[in-house]
């Protein structure tokens, strides 16, 4: 079994380097908005139809959470991801060093083969948030438990080492095991479903959160975190897409929201090129509601999330929500009214504008992005009369196989 999986991984990595960016780079879709909300119950249980297709939003068949366009795998639903529960219970050994990599990969392979169709070409998102693969990134009480458990594990496994050597061994063994779990899982997914876009949710991180700071908030990513992102070259090499989070922090002032989103996306664009000759596609995760109040995002909020993502040149935005959105007929109607009245019209506007700019400036062989990322007023929007803009503030990011200022030059 071990040799078989190892061979599959090598073959899969070769396949994925050939096929890595097939999905959201077709000329017809320079920017996509993807639905990652389990809303199937609205139609099935309450008779409320959510017209996602008519609004230009990409969804799975039947609006199911897992399907041909997007599937997200949580910590307790995929392989043998090790973590500690809220009461300190160790699941799958608790720490990466304590889980069998071979058993994890065997179980993950079974789940991939049975949950994703053989022609799957959607987004495959792994949501593993309990620990960070670099030792120094596990700060705060929630994550420090993994450092403490690693030290205990090392003391049990290597009792002959002195305390300083045990601490060093805990550090290195944690990082080696964490890397193996994440790297081999991505390679396995890309082997078995090579047309899918595989990556981890919330990677890369940025560390530019809002903590009631003074008026000098810039939105820049924390220097220590950008350094760690550079150290994670192996993760970007194994990924075929990046899924950073642009969830707006509670009470983040409107004046700072664009800077918050922009710098998170710019960091993703930076790491997208670290291990690839052509950048990985970036699809930012956004929410439908504010975390603190539960209010739906306003039109201004949508501009600072979806609008900024399109203007900076991402491949798309993934809209996330949980089962609460479809938990009752009333909530389904609220979601319907928000879709039809606010979200849907804005998505139609942005996706049409992105397509028009792609064809007018980039000959349909690339997507438009701001010439100056900090030009806050430059958006891919249709005019109020639905006419096209001049797009003078945008340049082209060419798709793989094309080059030049307007993506007109074939590139082998």
Curated annotation (Swiss-Prot):
Tissue-specific expression: Expressed in testis, epididymal tissue, epididymal luminal fluid (ELF), acrosome-intact (AI) sperm and caput (CAP), corpus (COR) and caudal (CAU) sperm. Higher expression in sperm than testis (at protein level). Liver, kidney, skin, brain, stomach and testis. Expressed mainly in granulosa cells of the ovaries. Expressed in small and large antral follicles. Not present in theca or stroma cells. Expressed in testis and liver. Expressed in testis and CAP, COR, and CAU epididymis tissue.
Function summary: Facilitates sperm penetration into the layer of cumulus cells surrounding the egg by digesting hyaluronic acid. Involved in induction of the acrosome reaction in the sperm. Involved in follicular atresia, the breakdown of immature ovarian follicles that are not selected to ovulate. Induces ovarian granulosa cell apoptosis, possibly via apoptotic signaling pathway involving CASP8 and CASP3 activation, and poly(ADP-ribose) polymerase (PARP) cleavage. Has no hyaluronidase activity in embryonic fibroblasts in vitro. Has no hyaluronidase activity in granulosa cells in vitro.
Gene Ontology cellular-component annotations: acrosomal membrane; acrosomal vesicle; cytoplasmic vesicle; early endosome; endoplasmic reticulum; extracellular region; lysosome; plasma membrane
EC class of the enzyme, as a word: hydrolase
Signal peptide: 1-22
Active site: 129 (proton donor)
Subcellular location: Secreted; Cell membrane; Cytoplasmic vesicle, Secretory vesicle, Acrosome; Endoplasmic reticulum
EGF-like domain mapped to chain residues: 353-408
Glycosylation, residue list: 69, 216
Keywords of the record: Cell adhesion, Cell membrane, Cytoplasmic vesicle, Disulfide bond, EGF-like domain, Endoplasmic reticulum, Endosome, Fertilization, Glycoprotein, Glycosidase, Hydrolase, Membrane, Secreted, Signal
Reactions that this protein is recorded to catalyse: Random hydrolysis of (1->4)-linkages between N-acetyl-beta-D-glucosamine and D-glucuronate residues in hyaluronate
Biological processes per GO annotation: carbohydrate metabolic process; cartilage development; cell adhesion; cellular response to interleukin-1; cellular response to tumor necrosis factor; cellular response to UV-B; hyaluronan catabolic process; inflammatory response
Species lineage: Eukaryota, Metazoa, Chordata, Craniata, Vertebrata
Functional pH dependence: Optimum pH is 7. Higher activity at pH 4 than at pH 7 in sperm.
Keyword Membrane attributed: yes
PANTHER family listed in its UniProt record: HYALURONIDASE, HYALURONIDASE-3
Induction section of the entry: Up-regulated expression in apoptotic granulosa cells and in atretic follicles of the ovaries.
Modification note: N-glycosylated.
Protein known as: Hyaluronidase-3
Transmembrane segments: none
Organism for this UniProt entry: Mus musculus
EC number(s) stated in the UniProt entry for this protein: 3.2.1.35
Family statement: Belongs to the glycosyl hydrolase 56 family.
Effects seen without this gene: No visible phenotype. Both male and female mice are viable. Skeletal features, joints, whole-body weights, organ weights, organ morphologies and the serum hyaluronic acid (HA) levels are normal. No evidence of glycosaminoglycan accumulation, including vacuolization, in tissues analyzed including liver, lung, kidney, spleen, skin, fat, testes and seminal vesicles at 12-14 months of age. No difference in tissue organization or connective tissue thickness. Only a subtle change in the alveolar structure and extracellular matrix thickness in lung tissue sections at 12-14 months of age.
Coiled-coil zones: none
Example GO molecular function: hyaluronoglucuronidase activity
């Amino acid at each position: 079994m071990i040799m078989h999986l190892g061979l599959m991984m090598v073959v899969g990595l070769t396949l994925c380097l050939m096929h890595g960016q097939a999905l959201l780079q077709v000329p017809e879709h320079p920017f996509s908005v993807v639905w990652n909300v389990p809303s199937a119950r609205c139609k099935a249980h309450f008779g409320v139809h959510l017209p996602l297709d008519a609004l230009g939003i990409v969804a799975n068949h039947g609006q199911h959470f897992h399907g041909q366009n997007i599937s997200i795998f949580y910590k307790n639903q995929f392989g043998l991801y090790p973590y500690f529960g809220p009461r300190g219970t160790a699941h799958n050994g608790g720490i990466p060093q304590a889980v069998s990599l071979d058993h994890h990969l065997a179980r993950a392979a079974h789940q991939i083969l049975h949950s994703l169709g053989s022609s799957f070409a959607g987004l495959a998102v792994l949501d593993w948030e309990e620990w960070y693969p670099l030792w120094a990134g596990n700060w705060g009480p929630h994550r420090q438990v993994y450092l403490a458990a690693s030290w205990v594990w090392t003391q049990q496994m290597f009792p002959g080492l002195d305390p300083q050597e045990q601490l060093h061994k805990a550090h290195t063994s944690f990082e080696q095991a964490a890397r193996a779990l994440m790297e081999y899982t991505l390679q396995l997914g890309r082997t078995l479903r090579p047309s899918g876009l595989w990556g981890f949710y919330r990677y890369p991180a940025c560390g530019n959160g809002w903590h009631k700071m003074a008026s000098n908030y810039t939105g820049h990513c924390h220097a220590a975190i950008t350094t760690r992102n550079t150290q994670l070259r192996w993760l970007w090499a194994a990924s075929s897409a990046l899924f950073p989070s642009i969830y707006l922090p509670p009470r983040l002032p409107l004046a700072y929201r664009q800077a918050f989103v922009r710098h998170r996306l710019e960091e993703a664009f930076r790491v997208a090129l670290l291990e690839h000759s052509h950048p990985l596609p970036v699809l930012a995760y956004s929410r439908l509601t504010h975390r603190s109040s539960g209010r739906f995002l306003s039109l201004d909020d949508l501009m600072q999330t979806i609008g900024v993502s399109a203007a900076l040149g991402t491949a798309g935005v993934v809209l996330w929500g949980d089962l609460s959105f479809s938990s009752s007929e009333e909530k389904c109607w609220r979601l319907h009214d928000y879709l039809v009245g606010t979200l849907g019209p804005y998505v139609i506007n942005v996706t049409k504008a992105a397509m028009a700019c792609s064809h007018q400036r980039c000959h349909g062989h690339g997507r438009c992005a701001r010439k100056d990322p900090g030009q806050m007023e430059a958006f891919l929007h249709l005019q109020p009369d639905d006419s096209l803009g001049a797009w003078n503030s945008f340049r082209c990011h060419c798709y793989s196989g094309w080059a030049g200022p307007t993506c007109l030059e074939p590139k082998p």
